[in-house]
Amino acid sequence: MEVSRRKAPPRPPRPAAPLPLLAYLLALAAPGRGADEPVWRSEQAIGAIAASQEDGVFVASGSCLDQLDYSLEHSLSRLYRDQAGNCTEPVSLAPPARPRPGSSFSKLLLPYREGAAGLGGLLLTGWTFDRGACEVRPLGNLSRNSLRNGTEVVSCHPQGSTAGVVYRAGRNNRWYLAVAATYVLPEPETASRCNPAASDHDTAIALKDTEGRSLATQELGRLKLCEGAGSLHFVDAFLWNGSIYFPYYPYNYTSGAATGWPSMARIAQSTEVLFQGQASLDCGHGHPDGRRLLLSSSLVEALDVWAGVFSAAAGEGQERRSPTTTALCLFRMSEIQARAKRVSWDFKTAESHCKEGDQPERVQPIASSTLIHSDLTSVYGTVVMNRTVLFLGTGDGQLLKVILGENLTSNCPEVIYEIKEETPVFYKLVPDPVKNIYIYLTAGKEVRRIRVANCNKHKSCSECLTATDPHCGWCHSLQRCTFQGDCVHSENLENWLDISSGAKKCPKIQIIRSSKEKTTVTMVGSFSPRHSKCMVKNVDSSRELCQNKSQPNRTCTCSIPTRATYKDVSVVNVMFSFGSWNLSDRFNFTNCSSLKECPACVETGCAWCKSARRCIHPFTACDPSDYERNQEQCPVAVEKTSGGGRPKENKGNRTNQALQVFYIKSIEPQKVSTLGKSNVIVTGANFTRASNITMILKGTSTCDKDVIQVSHVLNDTHMKFSLPSSRKEMKDVCIQFDGGNCSSVGSLSYIALPHCSLIFPATTWISGGQNITMMGRNFDVIDNLIISHELKGNINVSEYCVATYCGFLAPSLKSSKVRTNVTVKLRVQDTYLDCGTLQYREDPRFTGYRVESEVDTELEVKIQKENDNFNISKKDIEITLFHGENGQLNCSFENITRNQDLTTILCKIKGIKTASTIANSSKKVRVKLGNLELYVEQESVPSTWYFLIVLPVLLVIVIFAAVGVTRHKSKELSRKQSQQLELLESELRKEIRDGFAELQMDKLDVVDSFGTVPFLDYKHFALRTFFPESGGFTHIFTEDMHNRDANDKNESLTALDALICNKSFLVTVIHTLEKQKNFSVKDRCLFASFLTIALQTKLVYLTSILEVLTRDLMEQCSNMQPKLMLRRTESVVEKLLTNWMSVCLSGFLRETVGEPFYLLVTTLNQKINKGPVDVITCKALYTLNEDWLLWQVPEFSTVALNVVFEKIPENESADVCRNISVNVLDCDTIGQAKEKIFQAFLSKNGSPYGLQLNEIGLELQMGTRQKELLDIDSSSVILEDGITKLNTIGHYEISNGSTIKVFKKIANFTSDVEYSDDHCHLILPDSEAFQDVQGKRHRGKHKFKVKEMYLTKLLSTKVAIHSVLEKLFRSIWSLPNSRAPFAIKYFFDFLDAQAENKKITDPDVVHIWKTNSLPLRFWVNILKNPQFVFDIKKTPHIDGCLSVIAQAFMDAFSLTEQQLGKEAPTNKLLYAKDIPTYKEEVKSYYKAIRDLPPLSSSEMEEFLTQESKKHENEFNEEVALTEIYKYIVKYFDEILNKLERERGLEEAQKQLLHVKVLFDEKKKCKWM
């Protein structure tokens, strides 16, 4: 692992010297141990973390990746790898043992290429998704698309391991990823899900090219596993001295055990995998089974040392753990490199095969630095000020700090942070790359930014510097131990001391007897300010004894003369001032004479007389004057060996005797809090025979042992110890008797203080006795549980506690007020911890009970009580039933049911013989609820029972009355139904007779002189066919092309035009686009239409493309169902075929089919308008479609009008006939009458009137009076619910021969009115159909309308248009002059040839292909959409009728025989008799085309060339090319990848890249 170190940011210029108050405030503001550290929390457990040198911190949790700023206070961006946009976490099998990282979706998180010249930083992420995919993204923002990605790079199993490192190698300095992963796991359910390709099944280490698009594996880029190697769990990957190292250990994922020793694999830092060997790592010292699990790894590069955390534990829980379970071991990299021989133990290469017995050499750690601990999880190492600093994470949420000595000797770790929740620390610790005083601590779902030292805990300069913490130093201006960055002007060496200075350089005030006549007060240390002041003051009298100023660059000194008057000075205050800060000290001379040692005497400011060996007042003299000047000159005392400290090792007979006599059995408790324990009991034998008994506690191997004297030997088998406070850890315990060997007791765990998370229930009754449960952790170290009440004080409560649970009975507070709150407290040693609040409320109130007996051997007792908030459980309640004189039965609690008013408690008494007797006897019920005991009164008979007696009598009376009323109503209903049936029969007879008569007698006079057929020009015909649903393209494609310069086409479009004329390229692009999931059916149709327009003048080339794509489509369909080919428009070629047919058949459509088609539409319109048409719904009496049948029609009649047209400037011709007779219906609205009048004018004069419908009005001429006719006016009928009925001719009572004047409106014109649901015409609202809206003679008419009565109208309409329809059909499937259109003949021959090539012998297949390509794909589209061909407006009703005609047309081409019954839809039945005739004609049509002589290629090319010339400059081809490029650039990477894989398209690939450059430059120019 490579750790970058940045220089500290430039500091601001030095300000003026701050005041002492400011220095004090700065000291308060500096962060301390208790400050809240910033925490970032995720939704799921964190699986990976990395810090970038410039772009913040990256954290992977579940399926999410977050980018945070360095302070963890702001989230910069987030990436969701789950398609649903959730941060899900893996649902793994049984949770793995804690010494190993658990399941995670994230496998790699590697920032790289940071700071490279001219290159931006990148982030490589590896996930289990998509078979172990890796992505490369820019470091700046995760939301940007990935630059490169590849599959099968990392392990795709959430439990599997992955380690990797990115480096540069080769001549071109390309970036490579060396990755080691557990690609295959033994679990069958996961193996089938995401195993890699067979060639990668035994891959252990792979080399990937990160600059390739798919992160492809190098040709020599795999290192394989030996057959018997099993699964390897890789922990880390790092670079050192030109090699890549992978620490790992063999691991059985099924059993959860390590199957071999941890090892280190080594490969060369090269462009291919060059295996350089492996070496085993032995960190098993101090553990009987060895430590075979490798938990964490860190390379201390500056020291060329690798640190690892090893573990022997294989399961969860303290019962599987011991004080020696884990260890920190340091290995010299040079030794690992020397011993990593190329043995084939776990890995095989091409040169060497796996050999049994060829074991790797074992490397031993640096013994002095090995640190043994009970529960380490992670390590990170670095070098600060030439000191090696190691940070260690633990399983109980601690962050430890170890500082190695000169010989790499580990000191006792310092706890620099503890997680309150005790979450295990993540296996990877990450330093802050910007500020090296921080480290990121990850645990569970949280990341914290922690300061790397607690400098402020050192209160003095000497304490600060003797702690040897390289992060800390003494700040003179603040008089505190701080980080250098927290000290003002720390760059000034006079203001800052680090550990290299040593404690001797700390500033210190000393009082020295310089001579017999005077005493000197001075300051020693490394501090030499330019100017200083000093002053000595008598504290008792506030008198100054001395005051002085220093000479430049010299320390101030104060001389006090030796006077008899100064003997009474007991306390002096000495102060040195240095401009911005002061140094002061107080000396007390009261006890000088009591001090017996020279160092202690001189330290307090007293004077030591050498010859007399006594301590005196400093302002008096020795006799003779033989005092020591300072502490350094005191004689060195020889230390005596004390009884404490380390236990003596006595190997004499006493030891052997102790081993034979004394016996240790157990220690209780085995867990104590960090506060210690005053009564720990050790059990065994023969304790009273020993005189000196000590307990020795040994925790972390590099820390001092605790030696504790026995407190009290209780008897021969029990003794008591009082344990001191300690940090959280597990310790070995042994007992030493009389200086003999230490007998092991086992282990003892120091754990954190208890923590409460829940009290349930939180409300109880005042009498107490309810079972209360507390949830939390570390409850097994509680001494007492106390209820604290404001009146009753502290109440000790009996409790039962385990680690996470504590139960107790709520005490009674009966004498207190009814509603009160108490505090639950936990006592640990002499410390009280608040656990929460317990609410007391008044006792429950019981209202009664009842006893029921459904079975003779069982009684049910139901007790009612008032509703309350007590959560009563089965353990809280006891119910007893007393019956007879002495009978007593216990009732078993069943459940409690809470109702709206009362709560019911149900209990049952089972196994009795006389249940019914007991239920009817005298009885009472006793309820004991905790401490509450009471008798419940039996429920009284409610008054409702009397009501239940009267109820049956009333019920009988009501029933008889109801029967009488019902019979009367039934008779009335039968009479009305008979009348209605008679009326309905009469109506049916009339309608059937009228329908029959109309069918036989009706005749439609088709107007043949319909004038010129209003054909659309080719341009609009083509666009409506190409884009039936996209009207927005009409304008951009039809701009004036004649004024455009042909040479004006820009270079990018010219290049693209040339590129799509490359057939292989274009076909490849189309196939690639169709494989994209988000390339929808709409996109395919649009792309085909854009391509048709772009190649409109290159129809020969377009036809060749159509041929290739059709053949490819045949290849796809021939393997599945060939009859389905071309049936739907789901591919580009199908829409392309539609467009091609439209282009090639446009002339045939205009010359042959257009006129009969227009005649059909006109005839159909005439027939529809002959009968009533509802304006609102567009339904009509005469129709071909049952869904559009107006069967709610009233009686109607024809009204002949004499219409007079006003002379207008738009139509002043003298030849125009202005008096016209027009027939309308009395049920027509005024708007419908206008349309018929306009149509009559057009038919009479051959030209339109000159105005639009909304520009004219109608006036009824009544003598000298006129009345304007409107659809809605003041006389309109308003129905219920505010619905307005539109005015009709009948509404105005206009009779035959009435004169109507057509005039031009003067007011502003309005567009055609779209009537809302608030209006109606012929179809009335349901509630109105029962009312008489047209007079009494029509009463009830609407009520009995039946749809089937009017089905003959469908047949009548069919007969009216039949001859016109057949003329149209035969114009389509006939061959004028015995010649088929070129396009049809060519494509049908093409289909015949392809069928023959593919050996398709079924003639039905070819018939279906032809039907799908011509009638279905072209003619049906035209028949249903006349507005594609003519300049007319298609109404919804016409659309419904044309759908029936189009269906009949397609049925004529179908090969299946129609099996129609009486229940078949009318749309099918209408042309059922005609279809067989049509089918025969179609077969003859197909045969005639096939029998025609084939077209030569030159004929077809000539035809296509002529068609191309016809349509030159019809469309704006540049727009089409631009739209095509949008699709190409959207899927640019996919197209480019496809071109790379296809042979022969290298030139096309270059052209495509050139086109993209041209378009990109054009885009840049637009912004300039």
From Swiss-Prot:
Cytoplasmic side: 966-1568
Sema domain ranges (all copies): 35-452
Tissues where the protein occurs: Detected in heart, brain, lung, spleen and placenta.
Glycosylation sites (chain numbering): 86, 141, 149, 241, 252, 386, 407, 548, 582, 653, 692, 771, 796, 821, 871, 890
Membrane topology term: Single-pass type I membrane protein
Subunit text: Monomer. Homodimer. Interacts with SEMA7A.
Descriptive protein name: Plexin-C1
Species annotation: Homo sapiens (Human)
